[in-house]
């Protein structure tokens, strides 16, 4: 519809009429109201105004561009001399612009440029003037402040001077007044003396004058005393300042003297010190002493160490060597002692490799035995004969050994071993590691006996007598493991026994670490192991049952036997450990101990009152009821077991828990099972070894040693050991390192073999099942047990469609290497009771890596499960939306068959799919090509209306057919 007035044009533009009136007035079109007529010229002026205001130009309408092409052919000879025809196309392009537009545009541009330059110059001058005014104002302000400060100082000085002058004048006036008063008093006294009687006139004025004179004398004395005190104080202060300066000067001189003495002492040669402390040699002739002390022109004085080394050679007349003093001047042989000091020679001797037939340690002989060194050593060689009989050694060859270590075991040079290996066809280096078979062949080739050492077995390194066969067996405290279902009160029971509050500090109120404590009771010491009750911590409970003597099975009286209770019973029975049942929470109203007993009897735990061997003790961790009876039963079981262990022997134990502390390094909680573990011992725990640098008890207090059944926390291992590894004390750190490295290599081989098998298995499964979604994860936990439990729990979530892939799992904080690994593998990092450092957080933000922190295992498992649910392919469901009956069929050229239909049920949508039914049999399933009502395309047709429909790629439509219209919806799935 054409717009004739302002209101209609505004409705067409979908904008308020008031705004359109403002734009028209700005464009120079005078329209007062919405009903004013609007012509095409007015619209054109409005359009030009809007284009100019938005920066558009109408240059495209005022210029014409012509392009002309011209094609020609040229002939040119190629490299072979043949003529070739080449098509050449020439393009010419010309643009024609109206002159008035060009001139107007140029003038406008020049004017605009001039205006801009003038405006910029004006702004620059205004800015300079403003800056200059600010600078002048600032300088004037500073000048005013300086003048005010000087005036204030001058006023203060004048005020002080005036006050001092007024004080002086007041003092003079007081003194003059006192003198005038004294003179008047004397005159009055004299006049009174003349009038009155002589005796009385003389006595009274005399008293008054005496009092005045005494008062004046006292004032003068006080002034003199004050002046004297001020003078003494000033003199005292000056003396004190002079004394302090003198003290500072003396200290400086003393420090300089001390520094000078230290420099002189450090610059003093060492040989003078050695010579001063050398004991006298009475057996030496005095002449030799004088010669050595003074020296000669050809032989300077030797240091004390070198002279002492030269004396034994001087006592051997059979050597035949000429004296150094008698050597000719032209002899170029290097004399001992002319260029090296004694301590340098000793160091050279120590560095040399001692071999048979060379007692000098290789000193003063180059690595090439040249002719220059032969004459010097011929006589010394005659004094020592190498053994002619070969020495056959028994060499214990471990699983792996380096070339240098093998040569050291045979007491030969490493180069000899390398030569033998080269003859055998192998090029090796001094640090290359050989396997056991190759090393044994080399040993036999060199004429020694090779024995295979079983270094992986720690018992082979210790003599049976040292292990404890002769050590005295002494009674040891029992190790008691507290087991049961989650939230049955295991930690609370231990807290009441230990008088501690561990359960209150647990995240989520559940135990997620295995804890070790020892408690002193009136009847002895008892060591407790607290295990988690959650189903994920199966391995922790198994370790606790392995290291224990007695199991306390905690069962809640109001809950009964639960799955983890049954698991704890199976662990205890597998280890052959006696069970003491503690029925907890008997203080609750809903407690039913009899039902608990019946359920435990069904699991094979029979109470003593029923004829079994398991004592049942009802307890309450809240009120403390039955705790003493429980401890009594535990100690009674320990007495029956007669637990003993050697004390004076190397310690053996088991790793209860291990973690990586940021400040302490690898930390392991060890339960000593036999012997005594002391600080400084060399321990081996699985693939980790080291010397015990620090040892703490369960309360964090340092301890020097730990006996049997005592849990301690040790530091100083090379890496984090595995929870459950055996700990043994070895006498030699080198052997411990050798065993640990061998175990690492074997563990690495087994791990690689498992990975290869897993890869092959997963590849075959993927080929059989198709595409499988993977959720890569990197898990970092605070302790080994938590990491192990979390990995197992997450791996159990894997299904046939979505699998959890543990890229890496370790103990400790989240580092930059973990973030880089996550970037490469596109994994999510899970931190369980750990945090990422600043560099790792920054790198994760830069690379978009998701880091999740958890302190409760439930939360971690639930969130990973939700993430896996989101990765599942959605389920597709068909929803029938309507039914259509074909009433008439039309054949349309170039279109196909069109069905005239009636919607009998539901609704038909343009985007729906269609299923064609003929006699209730599906003959086609496809999509709608068009949906029309009369001549218009529509999006949907509801029930009771007619419509026209055509199907894609299907024209076999017959009257009476039915169309079933349906939609496919996707429904999210969950695990």
UniProtKB/Swiss-Prot annotation:
Residues 359-372 have a biased composition (Gly residues). Residues 584-587 are annotated as: G4. It is found in: Cytoplasm. GO terms for cellular component: cytosol. Coiled coil: none annotated. Residues 509-513 are annotated as: G2. Residues 484-491 are annotated as: G1. GTP binds at residues 484-491, 530-534, 584-587. Residues 475-644 form the tr-type G domain. Residues 104-115, 178-211, 302-330 have a biased composition (Low complexity). One of the essential components for the initiation of protein synthesis. Protects formylmethionyl-tRNA from spontaneous hydrolysis and promotes its binding to the 30S ribosomal subunits. Also involved in the hydrolysis of GTP during the formation of the 70S ribosomal complex. This is Translation initiation factor IF-2. The gene is infB.
